Every structure is written in structure tokens, then in C-alpha cells.
């Protein structure tokens, strides 16, 4: 970020069904690519559009109601946003940014900016975050299987023991190496602090898994859910989740669940005065 640039926070929601994930990829429709194309249209960019930095790089098919990103805009771009449009009075830049991005995305988009604000000093959508909270939906034999929810719910044929799943999930909390539940990436740590993990049934009998951590490694949430489903089916005991975790290597004892059941619900940040300090702390490598 240059000294003259202004940073904006964008709160974003999307249905991930038709996206190849968040991250921009050549010749594939992604959330980042779609939003950056909208920015390029607004600012008439002939080269690289303003780049988005995101709190959580969701995989293909994963949804979000509470994704957070930031974008740095030049003084000229901010002035363009503030410029009166038609009969409108001069606009607040953040209001105009939200309105114009959503205008480019169309009347019935599968991604939109739900809020735009000028970011406080020190804010970084990725590194300032304290936690990310996800929800996973599973319909089993006794749950209502609603065709209208098929794009955001995983289905399993058996009846699941939600109490056993909840006990297994609770035992996973804390700072640990989750290599057994992560897809390996060279140079990336698999040490995470799991802050919340629980299971319950909603009014329609659908199982809702809620999981929060300081950060998640690749496929970690869906692997954790897959292990819990094995517990719910009686194929694993609740305590086996900890045993598998402590082995620190991928196993065939459970399957990674489908992306469609997963939604990023919320990203949490500290008070404004702590944003910069949190970002510096997070950039350091996690250790046990």
C-alpha cells in the first residue's frame, strides 16, 4: 500500500456453486476474478485492476455470507468514486464503491458487496483477522431433505449421532498441529488454534457444524467434518479424532466432505487500535 492510497474494507457474500473458488485463475470463473473485473470496468483499467486481499481463500463450491477483503485505491480512483453521477450529489467514496461494483455485477448476482467502508489504519483483511467462523450443513436420514437447499447441504444416507459428533468435536479444541486434517502445501504450517467446534440439529433436523479458528489450512474444515461424520455413523469413536490428529499425517480413516455444505459465516477482528499489531503477529510462523 502506497502512502497516498486509500484502503477500503469490503464485506462480501456469494453462492460458491458456479465459482472455481475465491482465487483468480486463468480461464476459470472465480470470486476474486469476477470482483476485480468489476473494479476494472469501474476504473476503466487497461492493465491490472485493483487487487483484492481476502480473509479466507475459499475452495471451489464453498459459499460465504461474511467474507472480508480489502482493496487499495489511488487518489484518482477515489476522486472518480466521489464524482457526482447523473443528478446525484457528490458521493461518499465507500458508498459509491459498493453501489458501482454491485451495479456491474447485475440485478441477480451470485456474488455481491454487502458493505464497503474506509478501512481504519493498520487494517489487513487477511493478517488482522482474529478468527474465521464456518458453518457446515449435513442432512442425514431423519433430516428434512429440501431440494431448495441442495447447493448448500451435504447429504448422507445414515442416521448420525449428533451428541457423539459434538463430543468428538469438543476434544479437538486448542492449539495443535492439524497436519492429519490438512492438504499439505510446501512451506505452509499446519499449526492452528481451534477456538470453537460444535454440532447440533436445527428445527428441520439438519445437522449444523460450527467451527472457528485463527486460520484454517487447505481442506481442514471439510476434513474435520468428514471425521465427525464417521463418528456419527459409529465408525470412529469421539476420542479417535484426537488420536488421528496427534499422528500428524493424512489418513484414510475419513473422507473430506463436499464443498457445497460449507459456508464462511464471519471473520472477526480486534479493536481498531490493535489491527496493526495483530497483522504483524499473524505474519510470524505459528509454533507449538
From Swiss-Prot:
EC number in record: 5.4.99.12
Residues annotated to bind substrate: 134
GO BP of this protein: tRNA pseudouridine synthesis
Signal sequence, start to end: none
A Pfam family this chain is assigned to: PseudoU_synth_1
This protein's record includes keyword Heme: no
Source taxon at top rank: Bacteria
Molecular function GO terms recorded: RNA binding; tRNA pseudouridine(38-40) synthase activity
The entry's keywords: Isomerase, tRNA processing
Active site per database record: 59 (nucleophile)
Gene3D superfamilies: Pseudouridine synthase I, catalytic domain, C-terminal subdomain, Pseudouridine synthase I, catalytic domain, N-terminal subdomain
Keyword tRNA processing listed: yes
Reactions catalysed: uridine(38/39/40) in tRNA = pseudouridine(38/39/40) in tRNA
Subunit note: Homodimer.
The protein's role, per its UniProt record: Formation of pseudouridine at positions 38, 39 and 40 in the anticodon stem and loop of transfer RNAs.
Family: Belongs to the tRNA pseudouridine synthase TruA family.
Protein name: tRNA pseudouridine synthase A
UniProt lineage: Bacteria, Bacillati, Actinomycetota, Actinomycetes, Micrococcales
Amino acid at each position: 500500500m502506497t502512502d497516498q492510497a486509500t484502503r477500503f474494507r469490503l464485506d462480501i457474500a456469494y453462492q460458491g456453486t458456479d465459482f472455481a473458488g475465491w482465487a483468480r485463475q486463468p480461464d476459470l470463473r472465480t470470486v476474486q476474478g469476477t470482483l476485480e473485473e468489476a473494479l476494472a470496468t469501474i476504473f476503466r483499467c487497461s492493465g491490472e485492476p485493483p487487487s483484492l486481499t481476502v480473509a479466507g481463500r475459499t475452495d471451489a463450491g464453498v459459499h460465504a455470507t461474511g467474507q472480508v477483503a480489502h482493496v487499495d485505491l489511488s487518489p484518482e480512483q477515489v476522486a472518480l468514486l466521489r464524482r457526482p453521477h447523473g443528478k446525484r450529489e457528490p458521493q461518499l467514496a465507500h458508498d459509491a464503491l459498493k453501489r458501482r461494483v454491485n451495479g456491474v455485477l447485475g440485478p441477480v448476482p451470485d456474488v455481491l458487496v454487502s458493505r464497503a467502508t474506509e478501512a481504519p489504519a493498520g487494517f489487513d483483511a487477511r493478517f488482522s483477522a482474529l478468527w474465521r467462523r464456518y458453518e457446515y450443513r449435513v442432512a442425514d436420514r431423519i433430516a428434512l431433505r429440501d431440494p431448495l437447499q441442495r447447493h448448500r447441504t451435504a447429504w448422507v444416507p445414515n442416521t448420525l449421532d449428533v451428541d457423539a459428533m459434538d463430543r468428538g468435536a469438543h476434544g479437538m479444541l486448542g492449539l495443535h498441529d492439524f497436519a492429519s486434517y490438512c492438504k499439505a502445501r510446501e512451506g505452509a504450517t499446519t499449526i492452528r488454534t481451534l477456538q470453537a467446534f460444535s454440532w447440533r440439529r436445527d428445527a428441520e433436523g439438519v445437522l449444523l457444524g460450527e467451527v472457528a479458528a485463527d486460520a484454517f489450512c487447505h481442506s481442514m474444515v471439510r476434513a474435520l467434518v468428514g471425521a465427525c461424520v464417521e463418528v456419527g455413523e459409529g465408525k470412529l469413536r469421539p476420542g479417535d479424532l484426537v488420536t488421528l490428529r496427534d499422528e500428524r499425517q493424512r489418513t484414510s480413516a475419513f473422507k473430506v466432505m463436499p464443498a457445497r455444505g460449507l459456508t464462511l459465516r464471519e471473520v472477526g477482528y480486534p479493536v481498531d487500535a490493535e489491527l496493526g499489531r495483530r497483522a504483524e503477529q499473524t505474519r510470524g510462523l505459528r509454533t507449538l
